[in-house]
């Protein structure tokens, strides 16, 4: 079997410091110690593909167990919508959302899934999670 030629593309996404993402707001969870699961499904996620400059569309699903703070919904909507003009790879989207979410509300756990629309006959689903130790 012949080795496959590998090509490493030097494509730049929007630097983190230039993303201008809307801040995530929180409110106090009045029942700390009582574990509940909160699910969000954001069906209109859009970002820009750094390779093609075309829009990428996805459904972002997020499930978390709050600790002492909950995410405020309007700020979450504005945060997700603020990716609209960001050049970013699918894999990086989910990791950035995870990092920002954990930094904002310090949940007991969170699972995030990005279900990206088919592009070039390939469907991409990216998952990441966090568990407070």
Residue ranges of predicted features:
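N-terminal intrinsically disordered, cationic/polar leader segments
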Residues: 1-133
């Amino acid at each position: 079997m012949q080795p496959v030629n590998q090509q490493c593309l030097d494509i730049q996404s929007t630097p983190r410091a230039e993303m201008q993402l809307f801040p995530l707001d929180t409110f106090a969870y009045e029942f700390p110690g009582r574990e509940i699961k909160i699910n969000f499904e954001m069906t209109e996620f859009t970002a820009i593909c750094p390779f093609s400059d075309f829009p990428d569309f996805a459904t972002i699903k997020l499930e978390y167990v709050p600790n002492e703070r909950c995410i405020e919904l309007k700020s979450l909507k504005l945060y997700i919508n603020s990716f609209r003009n960001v050049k970013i790879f699918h894999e990086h989207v989910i990791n950035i959302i995870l990092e920002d979410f954990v930094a904002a509300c310090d949940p007991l756990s969170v699972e995030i899934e990005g279900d990206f629309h088919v592009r070039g006959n390939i469907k991409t689903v990216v998952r990441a999670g966090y568990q407070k130790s």
